[in-house]
């Protein structure tokens, strides 16, 4: 199997397209659909949940985690890979049940706004933030 060079992947992401990032076979041995959060559309979420069938996550920096007042999902993370899940989120306004592709895309766009505040989100929700580990 051949892999695309990183500059090509970055160009695809900048253009609003999804790419598949594959981790090591000695880790989870899986692929994740990755795209720029600021460009996510309901059709992208629909594709993810229809074809990838996993959780819809949002990678956030430590600074953004603090800005949004997100706390770890658990106090003691005993998961095999210690993935930094925070509590799940939903946009406080502009959503119905939160589960639709429209609602999830709206929640992501709400959470990444430069001036986003904790009051812009409710918990729990249908988007699962992951605090990035640099």
Give the predicted meaning of each segment:
Residues 1-134:
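Catalytic domains of riboflavin
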């Amino acid at each position: 199997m051949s892999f695309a060079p990183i500059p090509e992947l970055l160009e695809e992401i900048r253009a609003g397209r999804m790419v598949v990032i594959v981790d090591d076979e000695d880790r989870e041995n899986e692929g994740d659909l990755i795209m720029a959060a600021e460009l996510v559309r309901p059709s992208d979420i629909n594709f993810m949940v229809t074809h990838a069938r996993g959780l819809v996550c949002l990678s956030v920096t430590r600074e953004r985690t603090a800005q949004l007042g997100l706390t770890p999902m658990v106090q003691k993370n005993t998961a095999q890979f210690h993935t930094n899940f925070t509590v799940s989120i939903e946009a406080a306004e502009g959503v119905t049940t939160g589960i639709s592709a429209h609602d999830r895309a709206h929640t992501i766009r709400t959470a990444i706004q430069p001036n986003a505040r904790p009051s812009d989100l409710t918990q729990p929700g249908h988007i699962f933030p992951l605090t990035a580990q640099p």
